[in-house]
Amino acid sequence: MKQYLIAPSILSADFARLGEDTAKALAAGADVVHFDVMDNHYVPNLTIGPMVLKSLRNYGITAPIDVHLMVKPVDRIVPDFAAAGASIITFHPEASEHVDRTLQLIKENGCKAGLVFNPATPLSYLDYVMDKLDVILLMSVNPGFGGQSFIPQTLDKLREVRRRIDESGFDIRLEVDGGVKVNNIGEIAAAGADMFVAGSAIFDQPDYKKVIDEMRSELAKVSHE
């Protein structure tokens, strides 16, 4: 298994002090910044765009930034996020008219590319694009708002995606987003995930390092027989 990565979702941070909160989470031991983009069309919420990402880079954030696009259409905005400093760009297959083309567009703009699957989205979109993926992100809540509870059926879906990744032989991260907490991160990792998005579980606590250390401690107990 790859090294586990913890990716705080800045959707749950204090937007009035976003640079400071993001830097604090990284200093507390996080690996990746998860950046949620919502357009009030594909999902019923409106969040942040490329200018905010560029501001984080200008603030001095050098860690990988994982941009999760919950927008439709997708292709128009991809180059803007790449130019602003995105490291990874993921999108929902339902939001793209041509999934293969969007994946190629992300790569052409110098970013890693990934697909995102909502709780009820079938995995059949993976059938012909595994060779173009760096990340597969499973939503364990319905996208749109932070602070929701983990949907247990995601564990079976994780096992299936882990099997597909292992059989493909490709180097693909398996990421989970939604309701990830200290008390379930071990179970999620055991099902095959190696990258964990956590928003309110980290940012709603006064001590980010304590939460991230507790998550690492749970992950250290996971065995992959």
Swiss-Prot record:
Statement: the UniProt record of this protein carries the keyword Cell inner membrane: no
Record GO cellular component, one term: cytosol
GO MF annotations, alphabetized: D-ribulose-phosphate 3-epimerase activity; ferrous iron binding; metal ion binding
Family to which the UniProt record says this protein belongs: Belongs to the ribulose-phosphate 3-epimerase family.
Cofactors demanded by this protein: Co(2+); Fe(2+); Mn(2+); Zn(2+)
Species: Escherichia coli (strain K12)
Catalysed transformations (reactions): D-ribulose 5-phosphate = D-xylulose 5-phosphate
Keyword annotations of the record: Carbohydrate metabolism, Cobalt, Iron, Isomerase, Manganese, Metal-binding, Zinc
CDD domains: RPE
InterPro entries (UniProt xref): Aldolase_TIM, Ribul_P_3_epim, Ribul_P_3_epim-like, RibuloseP-bd_barrel
Pathway membership, UniProt: Carbohydrate degradation
Family annotation (Pfam families): Ribul_P_3_epim
Cofactor note: Binds 1 divalent metal cation per subunit. Active with Co(2+), Fe(2+), Mn(2+) and Zn(2+).
Function: Catalyzes the reversible epimerization of D-ribulose 5-phosphate to D-xylulose 5-phosphate.
Catalytic residues identified in the record: D36, D177
Binding locations of a divalent metal cation: H34, D36, H68, D177
Protein name: Ribulose-phosphate 3-epimerase
